[in-house]
């Protein structure tokens, strides 16, 4: 009997080709288009209608049924409110990671099972390992890096539990992006030449600052140099991220050396933005970070008192960094991560993700680091 797969179809080329490949592999395939954001009437920002039309065109072309589901309420409750709270607390969140965990897998799987699915599938560039059991006897599948190193998306899926990975197929995770485009062109799919989506799904093509100030009041404050000297005003700390180059709005500073300016530190207590020159400025360097509420793909991870050796990324596409993980007993499911080499601009609110070779072990949100605090604070 054919196994039934519901493919999350976004209107992009990756999910389109995923559906086509699964058909070729003999599965009974249907699509599901998820609407996760209720755009304002009359706005031109959201491409949801165009994306739905593209997904429908592909479904019609390859001869499958396309379902639709509205997860906007779940998205608001589980993702967007957290996103706003993190910005309000002075951190820089990554909503795509929470969206994958809560919506594109958890809510999607729940909905797909009501449609009689054996599996779901997505267009992510990751792979699923062989199903196994953890020490509690729970079945899960390891999350593996995608074959295409340049497109590997395991960083964004690290918070998805292995029991959900166990129910998911990743057809394009086994091939490279140029090959995906070729398959789409060969099949004459409407999405073959469509650009990859960029930015956060609920913002669309809007300027980020304009979007954020609709929900959070901006609190302007002083811009200061790394010696404490005031040199200007910022629009609100939430608009800046550590290590950011440019976009600070200073122009040429009288008496300053030529060179780029970087965000070095956010002084939340005094609402000051600390900037300085030098890509490797000491105030941006850290060797240790702390995280809590770690999501382990296996549902668990044995970390001995002597520490656990692995590699980690603190941002997407960063080369793997050798590190040792220690348990942090002061925090719920917390860890302390010590890197072999100093790390630049590790940002609270972003995620640290752990790997052993091809296996993505899981990760968590960065709370803080041991980067030095400016002397004048």
Curated annotation (Swiss-Prot):
Its EC number is 2.8.1.13. The active site is at 99 (nucleophile), 201 (cysteine persulfide intermediate). Residues 151-153, 315-316 are annotated as: Interaction with tRNA. It is found in: Cytoplasm. Disulfide bonds join 99-201. Signal peptide: none annotated. Its main location: cytoplasm. Residues 94-96 are annotated as: Interaction with target base in tRNA. GO terms for biological process: tRNA wobble position uridine thiolation. The record marks 124, 350 as: Interaction with tRNA. ATP binds at residues 8-15, 34, 123. The keyword Acetylation does not apply. It catalyses: S-sulfanyl-L-cysteinyl-[protein] + uridine(34) in tRNA + AH2 + ATP = 2-thiouridine(34) in tRNA + L-cysteinyl-[protein] + A + AMP + diphosphate + H(+). Keywords: ATP-binding, Cytoplasm, Disulfide bond, Nucleotide-binding, RNA-binding, Transferase, tRNA processing, tRNA-binding. Belongs to the MnmA/TRMU family. Catalyzes the 2-thiolation of uridine at the wobble position (U34) of tRNA, leading to the formation of s(2)U34. This is tRNA-specific 2-thiouridylase MnmA. It comes from Acinetobacter baylyi (strain ATCC 33305 / BD413 / ADP1). The gene is mnmA.
């Amino acid at each position: 009997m054919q196994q039934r797969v519901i493919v999350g179809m976004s209107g992009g080329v990756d999910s389109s080709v995923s559906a086509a490949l699964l058909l070729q592999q003999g599965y009974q395939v249907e699509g599901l288009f998820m609407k996760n954001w209720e755009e304002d009437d009359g706005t031109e920002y959201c491409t949801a209608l165009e994306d739905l039309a593209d997904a429908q065109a592909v479904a019609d072309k390859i001869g499958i049924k396309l379902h639709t589901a509205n997860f906007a309420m779940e998205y608001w409750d589980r993702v967007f409110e957290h996103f706003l709270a993190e910005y309000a607390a002075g951190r820089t969140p990554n909503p795509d990671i929470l969206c994958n965990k809560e919506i594109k897998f958890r809510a999607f799987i729940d909905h797909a099972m009501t449609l009689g699915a054996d599996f779901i599938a997505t267009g992510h560039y990751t792979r699923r390992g062989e199903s196994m059991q953890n020490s509690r006897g729970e079945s899960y599948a390891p999350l593996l890096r995608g074959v295409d190193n340049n497109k590997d998306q395991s960083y964004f899926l690290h918070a998805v539990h292995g029991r959900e990975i166990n129910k998911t197929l990743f057809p394009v995770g086994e091939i490279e992006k140029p090959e995906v485009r070729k398959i789409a062109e060969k099949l004459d799919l409407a999405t073959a030449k469509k650009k990859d989506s960029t930015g956060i799904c609920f913002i669309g093509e809007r300027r980020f600052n304009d979007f954020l100030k609709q929900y959070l009041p901006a609190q302007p404050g002083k811009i200061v140099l790394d010696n404490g000297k005031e040199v200007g005003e910022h629009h609100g700390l939430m608009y800046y991220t550590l290590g950011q180059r440019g976009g600070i709005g200073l122009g040429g500073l009288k008496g300053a050396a030529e060179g780029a300016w970087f965000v070095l530190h956010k002084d939340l207590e005094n609402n000051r933005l600390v900037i300085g020159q030098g890509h490797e400025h000491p105030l941006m360097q850290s060797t240790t970070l702390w995280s809590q509420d770690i999501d382990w793909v296996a549902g668990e991870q044995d970390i001995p008192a002597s520490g656990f050796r692995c590699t980690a990324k603190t941002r997407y596409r960063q080369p793997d960094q050798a590190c040792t993980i220690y348990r942090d007993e002061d925090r719920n499911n917390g860890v302390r991560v010590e890197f072999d080499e100093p790390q630049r601009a590790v940002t609270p609110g972003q995620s640290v993700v752990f790997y052993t070779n091809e296996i993505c072990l899981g990760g968590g949100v960065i709370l803080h680091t041991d980067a030095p605090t400016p002397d004048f604070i």
